[in-house]
């Protein structure tokens, strides 16, 4: 009888573990899903930016993005970007706030963008994004978005630009905070 109970307990335990594993995506599948989200965003954003340039309306891609893709950004990042955009609109003709594209870490747009290495860091993922210029992928990432999976979807929480001699310029949140102080 004792052997029978042990056998039944093992069967129930194995079904329970299997069900839990089926509900929890693996780190590998999460990373792939995250990378797919980032690639889709950059495909959309590059097309939006190109359309803005053709209309001779630089900067409007950021406005369109904040309007149409706001659910893709953390509240902190969205607030900082909206505040920066509002400050720059108050002083047309002057460079106020961000003087580069915060999602591309550039002033010009590449032909296209490719997702590279995806690195889990705690409950966030850092995704390398490379610009392709004249058919050649940059050897170093142009930008490294940081993402989290919240409320059933991916959101950008920051954009990293690499090490510089000025640490405040190494990521979008710190750049926005520095500009707000100025």
Short names for language-model regions:
Residues 1-8:
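Bacterial N-terminal signal peptides that target proteins for export
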Residues 17-26:
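Bacterial Sec-dependent signal peptides at the C-terminal "C-region" and cleavage site
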Residues 120-142, 150, 157-182:
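Low-complexity, intrinsically disordered terminal/linker segments enriched in charged
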Residues 24, 70-136:
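Surface-exposed, charged secondary-structure patches
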Residues 8-18:
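Bacterial N-terminal signal peptides
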Residues 30-50:
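Short, aromatic-enriched amphipathic alpha-helices that serve as compact interaction elements
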């Amino acid at each position: 009888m004792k052997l029978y109970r042990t056998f039944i307990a093992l069967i129930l335990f194995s079904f329970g573990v299997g069900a839990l594993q089926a509900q929890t995506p693996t780190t590998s599948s999460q990373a792939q899903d995250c990378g797919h989200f980032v690639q889709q965003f950059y495909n959309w954003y590059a097309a939006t930016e190109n359309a803005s340039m053709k209309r001779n309306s630089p900067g409007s891609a950021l406005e369109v993005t904040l309007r149409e893709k706001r659910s893709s950004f953390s509240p902190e990042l969205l607030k900082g970007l909206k505040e920066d955009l509002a400050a720059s609109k108050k002083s047309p003709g002057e460079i106020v706030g961000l003087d580069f594209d915060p999602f591309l870490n550039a002033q010009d747009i590449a032909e296209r963008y490719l997702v590279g290495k995806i690195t889990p860091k705690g409950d966030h993922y850092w995704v390398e994004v490379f610009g392709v210029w004249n058919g050649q992928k940059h050897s170093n990432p142009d930008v490294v978005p940081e993402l989290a999976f919240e409320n059933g979807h991916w959101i950008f929480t920051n954009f990293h630009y690499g090490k510089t001699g000025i640490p405040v310029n190494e990521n979008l949140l710190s750049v926005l905070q520095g500009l707000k102080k100025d």
